[in-house]
Amino acid sequence: MASTFLSSIGQQFEGLKIDGDQVWLRPPRASDYEGWHQVRSDSRAFLVPWEPTWPSDVLTRASFRRRLKRYARDVRDDAGYSFFVFRRGDGALVGGVNLSHVHRGVSQSCSMGYWMGENYARQGLMTDAVQAVVAFCF
């Protein structure tokens, strides 16, 4: 991509892939539900201390579809961009990175949040993912 993310992203987002050394990132898709459900379910106790309260239906397919709709609305409004993180080699979904509160103009800024499945933590995968997203953005 010739321009940086914070300059312009538009309709190019849907097919986007960001490469790191150990991971690659792309926007979430409906077909990611099983992998997302598995890693989030397996990591629930690990993630709960760091995240807002989990509603009782948070891991359902319907909830995942609502999440994807919210992500699409954020992209349409140029307000936020979400990525799933996949491990190189086996393609396992290991976490997610979210860019939110996107501000255009002079400041060209955003906030970043992330989550990592417990079985993939402390291996440098999220560090690699964050570095790849930062390089992509700026």
Residue ranges and their predicted role:
Residues 1-119:
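GNAT-family acyltransferases
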Residues 115, 122-136:
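Conserved acetyl-CoA-binding loop-helix of GNAT-fold acetyltransferases
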